[in-house]
Design a protein with these regions (language model features):
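A short, basic/flexible loop-to-alpha-helix module at the beginning of a structural domain
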Residues: 1-5, 60
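Glycine-rich adenosine-cofactor-binding loop
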Residues: 4-22
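Short active-site oxyanion
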Residues: 7, 31-34, 69-72
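Glycine- and other small-residue-rich loops at beta-strand/loop junctions that grip anionic moieties
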Residues: 13, 33, 37, 74
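NAD(P)-binding Rossmann-fold cofactor-contacting core
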Residues: 27-51
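Rossmann-fold NAD(P)-binding glycine/threonine-rich loop
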Residues: 44, 79-126
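Short acidic-hydrophobic, aromatic-tinged amphipathic segments that line or gate anion-handling sites
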Residues: 54-62, 99
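Rossmann-like NAD(P)-binding element
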Residues: 61-84, 96
Length: 126
């Protein structure tokens, strides 16, 4: 089924999430429902706030949006975040939302830039 608009939430708003967020914010077929990062002053958090996008320091706030989110992008690189998201989707019965791993983001950013983009992750725990 074709979509007219993708409703996206992004977890991780630092060096990896910010370039992705910039692309997403400029896409007319994307609605950003929220951005999460532990650092409320992370570059992507400031960008989201400036563009009127909801921000939170609790990534589970985005998971709790439920099936309103089409794609939940996790660029934290933290395995515990991925596991918590998967567990929440299972427990809540959410079979709609797709969780996108940072490796897929790396591929997308690399394709857009025409070169391999290396991801940077400063936080090991969330």
């Amino acid at each position: 089924m074709a979509k007219d608009i993708f409703r996206i939430a992004v977890i991780g708003a630092g060096e990896t999430g910010t370039p992705l967020l910039t692309q997403l914010l400029d896409a007319p077929f994307v609605e950003i429902l929220g951005v999460a990062d532990l650092d409320a002053e992370a570059p992507g958090m400031r960008l989201a706030h400036a563009r009127g996008v909801a921000t939170t320091t609790d990534f589970m706030d985005l998971a709790r949006l439920g099936e309103a989110v089409d794609v939940l992008i996790d660029v934290t690189g933290v395995p515990k975040v991925r596991e918590a998201l998967r567990q929440h989707m299972q427990d809540s019965g959410n079979t709609h939302t797709l969780i996108v791993h940072e490796m897929v983001v790396q591929l997308m950013l690399s394709l857009l830039s025409g070169r391999l983009v290396q991801l940077k992750h400063e936080v090991e725990e969330y």
